[in-house]
């Protein structure tokens, strides 16, 4: 199988302007990080998506975000986007899309590079829940990742590569996923 064609070429995440990675992310891994195992049904993600597609939860959590990445070997990982710091020993707060501050404290989110410990990725992006009224699909994926994709069109997965990832999710979760730019 040609992984370059299926998911894109491997690339490292971009570094900050000073040549380093974000210090608050180095050495951190999201607690919700999960590997999609071919042939096994991921009930956690399935339950989450089905719950979030109900009107009351969809409206309340529309901005919640799941991030995903495909590593060099073609393995798919995902996590809920989490804050860097723990609020207590049992809970890592899940971040909301574009959330920058809580009560004046800057939110430091764990991004795509933390899913692979800053190693190479083939494709990265976000998973968004489809609105309850959309009966054709349960979730969408895109190829948005600031450090793996932003600023260089050659780093962004193609629609075909994104659909290949969507197909992996569909197979593992038992729901309908669709690629969306």
Predicted features by range, described:
Residues 1-181:
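Eukaryotic phosphoinositide-binding membrane-targeting regions
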């Amino acid at each position: 199988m040609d992984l370059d064609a299926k998911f894109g070429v491997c690339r490292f995440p971009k570094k900050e302007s000073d040549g380093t990675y974000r210090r608050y992310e180095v050495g951190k891994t999201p607690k919700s990080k999960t590997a999609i195992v071919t042939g096994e049904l991921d009930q956690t993600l399935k339950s989450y998506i089905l719950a979030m597609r109900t009107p009351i939860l969809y409206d309340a959590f529309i901005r919640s975000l799941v991030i995903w990445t495909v590593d060099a070997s073609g393995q798919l990982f995902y996590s809920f986007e989490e804050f860097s710091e723990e609020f207590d020993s049992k809970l890592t707060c899940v971040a909301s899309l574009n959330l920058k501050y809580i009560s004046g404290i800057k939110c430091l989110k764990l991004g795509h590079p933390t899913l692979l410990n800053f190693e190479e990725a083939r494709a990265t992006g976000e998973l968004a829940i489809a609105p309850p009224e959309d009966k054709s699909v349960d979730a969408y994926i895109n190829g948005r990742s600031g450090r793996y994709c932003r600023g260089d069109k050659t780093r962004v997965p193609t629609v075909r590569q994104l659909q290949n990832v969507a197909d992996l999710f569909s197979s593992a979760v038992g729901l309908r996923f669709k690629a969306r730019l």
